[in-house]
Each structure stands twice: as C-alpha cells, then as structure tokens.
C-alpha cells in the first residue's frame, strides 16, 4: 500500500508538470497570435522563458529562502536532540546531512529547502520543538527529509518558476493589448477574417486573462500531491505511522505562524502557516490534515 501510494503520487506530479508546460505553451500561443502573427513563435518564446525561470530558481541560494522565513542556522551544541534527529533521518534516507535551522515562532511547523540533497536545509519552529515528543518529531523531520530525498523541493521550485513565467507573459500580453493595439490593428487590413480568426482572438484573450489563475491552481495541486508523498515516505523511513499520525493531529490544532509568510514559502511548510478558512479545497496550499491522517491509517 505504501509503495503504491508513493508511485501514484509521483505519476500525478508528472502529469501536473506536463499540464503546467501545456498552460505555458497556451499563453505563449495566445500572445504570439495577437502580437507576432505566429502561434508557434509565441509558444517557443514562452517555453524558453519558462525554462530560464526554472533553471534560475533551481540555483537560487538556500540562504535567501531561510532569510525570508527568519530562520537561524544552529549547531549540534545548541540543540543536540533536534540536530541528531535530523542526522538520523538523513542517514536512514541515505542523503547528505542537511543544514539545520530554527525559526523563533510559537506555532508548530517545519519545512525543507534546497535544489538537491547536496545543498539542502531543514527548518523547524521553536513551538514544534517544544511540543512534539521524539516519535512525533521524527515523523515531522522524516517528512521534511523525504522532501529532500524525493527532490520535492526542486519540483516545487520549478512550479513556482513556471507560475511566475505564466504571470509575466500574461501581464505583458495584457499591457500590449491595452497600449499596443496588437493584432486588432493589423486585422483592419484583413476585413472579415472569418470565423477561425474570431475564435482564435477569443481564445487568446481568454488565455491572457485566465492563465495566471490556472497556473496558481496547478501550483497548489503540485504542492498538495507532494505533501501526501512526503507523509508516506516519512512512514517508510521511521516505520512508525502512529508517530506521524499523532504529529499531524497536533499540527491540526496549531495556530497560524506569528510572522508573515509569503505565498511562495507557504507551500514549503508541512502545515499551512496561514491557516486560511472558508475556502474550497481547490485553493488550499496543503491537503486537509484529516485526509492525510486517513491515508496514513490505511498503511
């Protein structure tokens, strides 16, 4: 059951990334049709921008992410119990020892970052370290180490980059639509144009307007799938599903983080740091904890 769940989540994430690139191609085609008279040319430019964004984000420094979240690096002498749990989980997962950080915040939360296991880091809040017992903390750290081992952070980073690329291209297209005249000006030379031109024009306008929203939804879906996979992988590392389940139950009762967390960082945490309510599951950065517990109970 555990390995089937891991394989299923990996397949779903691949599908979501394919959808992301299709969305990027669609918005590129829309802008290309309106301003370059070339669907293919617009698609090519959009995909190139997407790849540039993705690679630049992959090599972004871990220090920047930690600074954005007010995290402080610690040594084994400062917090030996926490440090040794990270060390143990990394050893079981057969990855290099990540750098270890702590966030001075009373809420219960943790996250991992880095483009690969070789330059990864783990951070936990002081609230988490104070409330969780060893088995529960092993479950949480196992979850974060699983993100590193499974290259989840790289996938999440690519998703952020592609969403940013879609938003950029859509913004450019929108500005050109308002200030440039675009194809509508050239279309005056082609009276009539036929139904195909009208359909393509409508498609292009809708793509420019709706693509950023669609990109955000795909990004959130990728984040949710990664959380399910990391939960399952943590149990694989600790061989203790009850420890992870009890940790999730405590996380469910946690308050939002005291310091402000930007939207890009929110998806990295094991628990939604903003604790938004009143929204449909479609707009959550994380799957409902009750669903995560239910899946672990089936292991």
Curated annotation (Swiss-Prot):
Primary subcellular site in the record, as a coarse category: membrane
Enzyme Commission code: 3.4.24.-
Active site residues of this protein: 144
InterPro entries xref list: HtpX_protease, Pept_M48_protease_HtpX, Peptidase_M48
CDD domains for the chain: M48B_Htpx_like
Source taxon at top rank: Bacteria
GO CC terms: plasma membrane
Membrane topology listed for this record: Multi-pass membrane protein
GO biological process annotation, one example: proteolysis
Binding site for Zn(2+): 143, 147, 227
Cofactor needs: Zn(2+)
Subcellular localization: Cell membrane
GO molecular-function terms, A-Z: metalloendopeptidase activity; zinc ion binding
Bilayer-crossing regions: 14-34, 39-59, 158-178, 198-218
Cofactor binding description: Binds 1 zinc ion per subunit.
Sorted UniProt keywords: Cell membrane, Hydrolase, Membrane, Metal-binding, Metalloprotease, Protease, Transmembrane, Transmembrane helix, Zinc
Family of the protein in this entry: Belongs to the peptidase M48B family.
HAMAP family found in the cross-reference section: Pept_M48_protease_HtpX
Protein's name according to its UniProt entry: Protease HtpX homolog
Species of provenance: Streptococcus mutans serotype c (strain ATCC 700610 / UA159)
Lineage: Bacteria, Bacillati, Bacillota, Bacilli, Lactobacillales
């Amino acid at each position: 059951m555990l390995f089937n769940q891991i394989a299923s989540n990996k397949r779903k994430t691949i599908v979501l990334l394919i959808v992301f690139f299709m969305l990027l191609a669609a918005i590129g085609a829309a802008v290309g049709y309106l301003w370059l008279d070339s669907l293919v040319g617009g698609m090519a430019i959009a995909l190139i921008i997407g790849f540039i964004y993705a690679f630049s984000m992959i090599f972004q420094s871990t220090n920047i992410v930690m600074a954005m979240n007010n995290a402080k690096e610690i040594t084994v002498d400062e917090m030996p119990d926490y440090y040794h749990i990270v060390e143990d989980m990394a050893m079981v997962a057969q990855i290099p020892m990540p750098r270890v950080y702590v966030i001075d915040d009373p809420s219960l939360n943790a996250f991992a970052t880095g483009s690969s296991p070789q330059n990864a880091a783990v951070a936990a809040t002081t609230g988490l370290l104070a409330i969780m017992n060893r088995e529960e903390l092993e479950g949480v750290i196992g979850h974060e180490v699983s993100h590193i081992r499974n290259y989840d952070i790289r996938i999440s980073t690519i998703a952020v980059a592609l969403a940013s690329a879609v938003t950029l291209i859509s913004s450019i297209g929108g500005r050109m639509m308002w200030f440039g005249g675009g194809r509508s000006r050239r279309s005056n030379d082609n009276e009539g144009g036929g139904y195909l031109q009208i359909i393509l024009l409508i498609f292009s306008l809708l793509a420019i307007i709706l693509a950023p929203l669609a990109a955000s939804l795909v990004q959130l879906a990728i984040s949710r799938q990664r959380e399910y996979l990391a939960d399952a992988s943590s149990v694989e590392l600790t061989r203790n599903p009850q420890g992870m389940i009890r940790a999730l139950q405590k996380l469910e009762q946690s308050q939002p983080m005291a310091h402000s967390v930007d939207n890009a960082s929110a998806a990295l945490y094991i628990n939604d740091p903003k604790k938004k309510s009143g929204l449909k599951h479609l707009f959550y950065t994380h799957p409902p904890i009750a669903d995560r517990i239910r899946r672990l109970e089936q292991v």
